[in-house]
Structures are given as C-alpha cells and as structure tokens.
Amino acid sequence: MNKEREARKYLRLLSVRRCRHIATIVELVREVIEPAILAPYELVDIEYGKMGGDYVLSVFVDKPEGITVNDTADLTDIISPLLDQIKPDPFPEQYFLEVTSPGLERPLKTKEQLADAVGSYIHVSLYKAVDKQKVFEGTLLSFEEDVLHMEYLDKTRRKEVEIPYSLVSKARLAVKF
C-alpha cells in the first residue's frame, strides 16, 4: 500500500516536471521566434508535445486575410533556423516543426485576442460555474474591464451573461450551426 502511494506520488512529480519543462520550451520558443514573425502575420499560439510516438512543435500563425500554404512554408524557412540556433538545445528528443493555421476554431488565449473577437461567435469554458453553467457558446457582445458580456441560447430563449475574465479556463472561436 505504501509503495503504491509512493509510486503515484513519483508519477505525479514526473508529470509536473514534464509540464514545467514543456512550458519552459514553449516560452523559450516564443521568445526566440516572436520578433521574427512580422506584420501582417500574427503568432497565435505555440504547442509542444507528443503526437503518436513523435514530438511535435506546432506554431500557429494567422493574418487578416487568412494564411496560405505558401505562407506557412515561408514562415517555416524563417522559424527553423532560429530554433536551430538555441543553445543549449532545449528539446529532449528530435521533433517535427509544424507551422500551421489556427483553424476556424482558433484559441483566444489573451485579453487582446478576446477584445478582437467582439462580435464573433465563441465557446468559453470556466473554472467555476456562472448561472449554474461552466460552458457557454454564443456571441461575444463586449469585453470591457475584464468582463466578457455574451449572448447565448438557452434552449430557444436568448439570454445574456457577464463572465469575469478570471473565471475563463479556455476560450476559442466557434462555428455556429
């Protein structure tokens, strides 16, 4: 029983260390490549982790009129040499670099991205329930003073809700059906 508890504790510690290491890699990559991604491009997000048996560094970029395959190829040519110059190499194993569009349901990770999304249909997950709900999908009417003001459908009735930014665990654009 005691060995089992120790094993669980050790696995949790490894998991925390791995998460911290991944967060450090993402922060370092952002610091190195963000200055090189010039207008009209926008660095939306960076993710690093295992996909199947391989490590993948995903760099999500966008521009106002949308990103093309040629754009991602050009940005890969800019980003890859910058990553190769990082010393010491922060990556524990070989990885694939993927420069891609954030897609239709792009994440909204910063206050600036939320402010830019006013008028858009979004999906929001919360740490704590507001009006007995932890998930909302609807139109972002405004984002002022760290409060999201949304309109959503509750069955067939339109409702409005105010959500403190501090309660938002994840937000992304959503496709309205």
Swiss-Prot record:
InterPro entries, sorted: Ribosome_maturation_RimP, RimP_C, RimP_C_sf, RimP_N, RimP_N_sf
Compartments in which it is found: Cytoplasm
Source organism, top-level taxon: Bacteria
Keywords in alphabetical order: Cytoplasm, Ribosome biogenesis
Parts forming coiled coils: none
One cellular component term from this protein's GO annotations in UniProt: cytosol
Cytoplasm found in the keyword field: yes
UniProt-listed GO biological process terms: ribosomal small subunit assembly; translation
The UniProt record lists the keyword Cytoplasm: yes
Family label: Belongs to the RimP family.
General function of this protein: Required for maturation of 30S ribosomal subunits.
HAMAP family: RimP
Descriptive protein name: Ribosome maturation factor RimP
Source organism per UniProt: Streptococcus sanguinis (strain SK36)
